[in-house]
Curated annotation (Swiss-Prot):
Oligomer status and interactors: Homodimer. The tRNA molecule binds across the dimer.
GO biological process, one term: selenocysteine biosynthetic process
Catalytic function, reaction form: tRNA(Ser) + L-serine + ATP = L-seryl-tRNA(Ser) + AMP + diphosphate + H(+); tRNA(Sec) + L-serine + ATP = L-seryl-tRNA(Sec) + AMP + diphosphate + H(+)
Protein task: Catalyzes the attachment of serine to tRNA(Ser). Is also able to aminoacylate tRNA(Sec) with serine, to form the misacylated tRNA L-seryl-tRNA(Sec), which will be further converted into selenocysteinyl-tRNA(Sec).
Protein name: Serine--tRNA ligase
Binding site for L-serine: T229, A230, E231, E283, S383
EC number, UniProt record: 6.1.1.11
Pathway info: Aminoacyl-tRNA biosynthesis; selenocysteinyl-tRNA(Sec) biosynthesis; L-seryl-tRNA(Sec) from L-serine and tRNA(Sec): step 1/1
Keywords noted in UniProt: Aminoacyl-tRNA synthetase, ATP-binding, Cytoplasm, Ligase, Nucleotide-binding, Protein biosynthesis
GO CC annotations, alphabetized: cytoplasm
């Protein structure tokens, strides 16, 4: 969430920055209006409390019983007024908090302007799309022909946008997860294995709520939410904590399945496994000192790019424009791999700096020195990488004319030395 002091002290700057991302300035005005109401109520409450305290001291010195009783009755009325104002204050604070939570993060000044993804800027590309001497097939045809993806039984089990991985297909997915975790540990991340369901407070802390409520799965009976990304539980590992400066940076990697209703993507990517209600992802996450967060963003990007490189995939990196930037992000790099069977680039990693946006909501702070006033950390997140799109890219790039799929070298030790996937 944004700093209310920043909004109060620099409203024009905040409106201009949010305007670059298409935010109506009226949303900022609403937050400021609630803030003024809250401050006015606080002033009135403090004034009445000061009056009550002063008169209470006088009452103790009064010798006239009638005068004392009169003052006591007056102070009871003052107390009732304070209680009523406190209730009004709580209601205004709740409305202000709700309005504040609707505001997205401020785009970094260096982020390119643009209304949508067509204005994203390609800043790097490594490799060229493979030249085939046959027509490459899309992964859904390869998967069915090799009997490693079963769409029909996925639908039978759970409905549309579900599938079953079988045999070496399932093993390839597991190999990718294990290899990516091992790689990120080598890159300096600490592995954690978290719950896949979390309390609602975790969703607010990671800023998934209220923005993405309709895209999330929830267990209503126990009031638990299925994670849409490992970013949610990992953010909340240090919720309501004060870290010491010498603990930073904290870098974590985590595997979770991810659950999304995909209501925002209805009708898109209905073939294959590109977009499902359940998918696997390895996440990289950082808690860092504010002074180093943009250096850490470059590390995050480099680590995600290295993952693509080691898999032998052609990839490119884009900087997202203001209109495509995620709700919580100040700056984001998307890394895309080429999928020749579909003839398109697939996003497998999105690396973002969110500065203090999540930390303020989750109350995650650090102390720069003993006795110093705690300040909010900066947090960053990046996919390292997302499945099944990485699986798609491997299947389509490593396919052979006979329909088999060569297994990338780095994954073979995780697959018992298997070198190729053929129909058994």
């Amino acid at each position: 969430m944004l700093d209310i002091r920043l909004i109060r002290e620099q409203p024009d700057m905040v409106k201009a920055a949010l305007g670059r991302a298409g935010v109506d300035p009226a949303q900022v005005d609403a937050v400021l209006a609630y803030d003024e109401q809250r401050r006015a109520l606080l002033r009135e409450v403090e004034k009445l409390k000061a009056l009550r305290n002063a008169v209470s001291k006088e009452i103790g010195k009064m010798s006239d019983a009638g005068e004392r009783d009169t003052k006591i009755a007056e102070m009871r009325a003052v107390g009732d007024r304070i209680a009523a104002l406190d209730r009004e204050l709580a209601a205004v604070e709740e409305r202000q908090y709700a309005a504040l939570m609707e505001l997205r993060n401020l785009p970094h000044p260096a982020v390119p302007d643009g209304p949508d993804e067509t204005y994203n800027v390609v800043i790097a590309q490594e490799g060229e799309p493979r030249a085939f001497d046959f027509a490459p097939k899309p992964h859904w045809e390869l998967g069915e022909a090799l009997d490693i993806i079963d769409f029909e039984r996925g639908v039978k089990l759970s409905g549309s946008r579900f599938y079953v991985l079988k045999g070496l297909g399932a093993r390839l997915q597991r190999a990718l997860i294990q290899w990516m975790l091992d790689l990120h540990i080598q890159q300096g991340y600490h592995e954690v294995y978290t719950p896949f369901v979390v309390k609602e407070q975790c969703m607010w802390g990671a800023r998934q709520l209220p923005k993405f409520r309709d895209n999330l799965y929830r267990d209503v009976e126990d009031d638990l939410w299925l994670v849409p990304t490992a970013e949610v539980p990992v953010t909340n590992l240090h919720r309501d904590e004060i870290l010491e400066a010498d603990q930073l940076p904290l870098r974590y990697c985590a595997y979770t399945p991810c659950f999304r209703r995909e209501k925002m993507s209805a009708g898109r990517d209905v073939r294959g496994i590109k977009r499902g209600h359940q998918f696997d992802k390895v996440e990289m996450y950082m808690f860092v000192h504010p002074d180093t967060s943009y250096d850490e963003l470059e590390k995050l990007r480099a680590d995600a790019e290295a993952t693509c490189r080691l898999l032998g995939l052609t990839f490119r990196t884009k900087e997202l424009c203001t209109g495509d930037l995620g709700f919580a992000a100040t700056r984001t790099y998307d890394i895309e791999v080429w999928a020749p069977g579909q003839g398109e680039w697939l996003e497998v990693s999105s690396c973002s700096n969110v500065e203090a946006f999540q930390a303020r909501a989750a109350n995650i702070r650090y102390r720069s020195a003993p006795g110093a006033r705690p300040e909010y950390v900066h947090t960053l997140n990046g996919s390292g990488l997302g499945l099944p799109r990485t699986l798609i890219a491997i299947m389509e790039n490593y396919q052979q004319a006979d329909g088999s799929i060569i297994i990338p070298d780095v994954l073979r030790p995780y697959m018992g030395g298997a070198e190729v996937i053929r129909r058994s």
